[in-house]
Amino acid sequence: MEGVNGKKVGHLCENISSFVRQCIFSILSVGPVPSHIAFIMDGNRRYSKKQNLLDGNGHRAGFSALINMLKYCYELGVKYITVYAFSIDNFKRRPEEVVSLMKLMQEKIDELTKEESIVNRLGIRIYFQGNLKLLSDHVRLAAERAMVKTSGNSKAILSICVAYTSTDEIVHAVQESCEEKWDEIRKLDVNNDGSNLIRLEENVKDKNEHRIGVTNVDRHMYMSVCPDPDIIIRTSGATRLSNFLLWQSSHCLLYSPAALWPEIGLRHLIWVILDFQRNYLYLKEKKKQS
């Protein structure tokens, strides 16, 4: 009997919490709402030590925080959510820690793609961004399955950056742009003797047309599926970007709450949205000038 009553109370509290949240989001929606929020999920290990948890449980608590934040962003009307899950630099950690994180990552990826998962209930499409070749086969295949399984979802987009750094992304985009331009130029050499390439070199207009520009690099970025972020939230109080979205973050708001990632909550999101709305005109003007 107590168990049944406990469930009823829990369900009632959840309904009240959801109602209050919807009221708050309705008020916030009167002002501008960001289309893209990115998160640097910092502090899982420190949270584990702080709470005297077993290895890996800090990251499990962090996953729960991600699910809650994903739900809040969706309810607020944020179309794009990006999370920095695993840097290329993280491969330099102790081998046993990397193996443990890879196992946990695979477990949580599979959990996200279940029929009853939050991403399917809310219609969220998942992209994994980064140098996926660096991942173990099991994790890479799980990521690929998740992208295929959620490809029909269109209400919001969750980009999960794994085996990612911004410098690697930029190098990748420049390489792809060079190869694309070279293929275009080679197609002009119909005689395969270089004569058309010489004429191209002499024609200033054509030469400029085949130069690599910012738009070419933008198109080949891992993050090309999303607009530039409006807000980057890094937990644990650190203000550095740690090689995350350096190309895309020149005109976004950076928020660094002292809370560790598993401790992040609704109040932090509300605060940063209010800060974004206060600075909206300034940020908009800066984007126009760029």
Curated annotation (Swiss-Prot):
<keyword id="KW-0460">Magnesium</keyword>
<protein>
    <recommendedName>
        <fullName>Dehydrodolichyl diphosphate synthase CPT3</fullName>
        <ecNumber>2.5.1.87</ecNumber>
    </recommendedName>
</protein>
<dbReference type="InterPro" id="IPR018520">
    <property type="entry name" value="UPP_synth-like_CS"/>
</dbReference>
<dbReference type="InterPro" id="IPR036424">
    <property type="entry name" value="UPP_synth-like_sf"/>
</dbReference>
<dbReference type="InterPro" id="IPR001441">
    <property type="entry name" value="UPP_synth-like"/>
</dbReference>
<comment type="function">
    <text>Catalyzes cis-prenyl chain elongation to produce the polyprenyl backbone of dolichol, a glycosyl carrier-lipid required for the biosynthesis of several classes of glycoprotein.</text>
</comment>
<dbReference type="GO" id="GO:0005829">
    <property type="term" value="C:cytosol"/>
</dbReference>
<keyword id="KW-0479">Metal-binding</keyword>
<dbReference type="GO" id="GO:0000287">
    <property type="term" value="F:magnesium ion binding"/>
</dbReference>
<keyword id="KW-0963">Cytoplasm</keyword>
<comment type="similarity">
    <text>Belongs to the UPP synthase family.</text>
</comment>
<dbReference type="GO" id="GO:0005783">
    <property type="term" value="C:endoplasmic reticulum"/>
</dbReference>
<feature type="active site">
    <location>
        <position position="42"/>
    </location>
</feature>
<dbReference type="GO" id="GO:0016094">
    <property type="term" value="P:polyprenol biosynthetic process"/>
</dbReference>
<keyword id="KW-0808">Transferase</keyword>
<dbReference type="GO" id="GO:0004659">
    <property type="term" value="F:prenyltransferase activity"/>
</dbReference>
<dbReference type="Pfam" id="PF01255">
    <property type="entry name" value="Prenyltransf"/>
</dbReference>
<dbReference type="GO" id="GO:0045547">
    <property type="term" value="F:ditrans,polycis-polyprenyl diphosphate synthase [(2E,6E)-farnesyl diphosphate specific] activity"/>
</dbReference>
